[in-house]
């Protein structure tokens, strides 16, 4: 396939195709001064690109058609694939986005070496994780939330049991006692099939029966936060990621619909680790944990 080379490159983080007549673009971990790099890979026609994305979908056991023009799936290697087919929902035609995840877990030592965390921040988060606290890694999109979350999980003692719940399995954990659950979507099949969907809320409740020491949700967006809060109250270590620009914005999002977290439940959260992309001296961009904010009760 035309994108075989970037797919095999472990330093390529994202591959994007916005139209058949535009060059394939990618995000590269070693060239952080650029947002997107344009390659010399192009497709000759819309039909060629459609045929390719259909073959790609079939390799994952799914289909993408004019009747079902949106597909969100995962490759056998664990990479996330998003496709829009033809011009049913996207202009000017078929588009593709592939998010490639590291094949091996990134350790805390690596995160410190790359400057994502200072040694003091790392020590604090390590202690909080070992003590089974409730940690939310928050930040905007593509700011390194999942990478930081994965590195925190490597600090958990190997004798502890970890349960992860995700829409798309992204986390890689070097633990023998690791239970990984993922959602099942029946979108686009039929209205009756929606009864067989398995969402994050149901998975978090199911995970409690596996007696994990830690429950990890890839990202909270809805009612699964209720089950996660209950798990924290029961003494489980809880970690998750969340989209927010600041601790104040995170708290505001948690308070309003569809999350609607009661004020008292916010005190269960130990801290927010805030990540973002920052521009360094020389123009390069890097992901950094900029702040660790603890939740403190207001004085009455």
Predicted regions and their residues:
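Short hydrophobic/charged patches on amphipathic alpha-helices used for structural packing
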Residues: 4, 126, 204-205
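P-loop NTP-binding catalytic core
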Residues: 17-134, 176
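Glycine-rich, charged/polar anion/phosphate-binding loops
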Residues: 67-69, 80-85, 166, 202, ...
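Conserved P-loop NTPase
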Residues: 271-300
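Phosphate-interacting basic helix/loop segments used at nucleotide- and nucleic-acid interfaces
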Residues: 1-14, 66-67
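Switch/coupling sub-region of P-loop NTPases
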Residues: 132-141, 153-279
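Conserved lysine of the Walker
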Residues: 145
């Amino acid at each position: 396939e035309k994108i075989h080379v970037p797919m095999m490159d472990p330093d390529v983080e994202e591959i994007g195709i916005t139209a058949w007549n535009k060059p394939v673009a990618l995000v590269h971990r070693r060239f952080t001064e650029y947002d997107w790099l344009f390659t010399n890979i192009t497709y000759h026609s819309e039909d060629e690109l459609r045929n390719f994305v259909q073959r790609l979908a079939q390799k994952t056991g799914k289909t993408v058609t004019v009747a079902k023009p949106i597909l969100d799936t995962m490759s056998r290697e664990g990479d996330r694939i998003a496709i829009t087919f033809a011009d049913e929902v996207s202009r000017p035609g078929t588009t593709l986005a592939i998010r490639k995840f590291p094949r091996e877990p990134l350790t805390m030592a690596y995160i410190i070496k790359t400057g994502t965390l200072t040694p003091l921040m790392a020590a604090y988060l390590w202690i909080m994780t070992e003590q089974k606290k409730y940690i939310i890694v928050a930040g905007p999109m593509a700011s390194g939330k999942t990478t930081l979350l994965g590195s925190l999980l490597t600090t958990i003692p190997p004798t502890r049991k970890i349960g992860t719940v995700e829409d798309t399995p992204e986390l890689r954990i070097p633990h023998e006692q690791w239970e990984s659950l993922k959602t099942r979507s029946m979108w686009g099949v039929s209205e009756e099939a929606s009864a067989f969907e398995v969402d994050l809320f149901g998975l978090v409740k199911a995970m409690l029966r596996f007696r994990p020491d830690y429950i990890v949700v890839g990202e909270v967006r809805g009612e699964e936060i209720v089950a996660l809060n209950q798990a924290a109250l029961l003494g489980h270590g809880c970690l998750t990621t969340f989209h927010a620009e600041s601790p104040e914005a995170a708290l505001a999002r948690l308070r309003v619909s569809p999350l609607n977290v009661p004020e008292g439940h916010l005190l269960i959260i130990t801290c927010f680790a805030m990540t973002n992309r920052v521009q360094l001296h020389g123009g390069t961009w890097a992901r950094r944990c900029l702040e660790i904010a603890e939740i403190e009760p207001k004085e009455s």
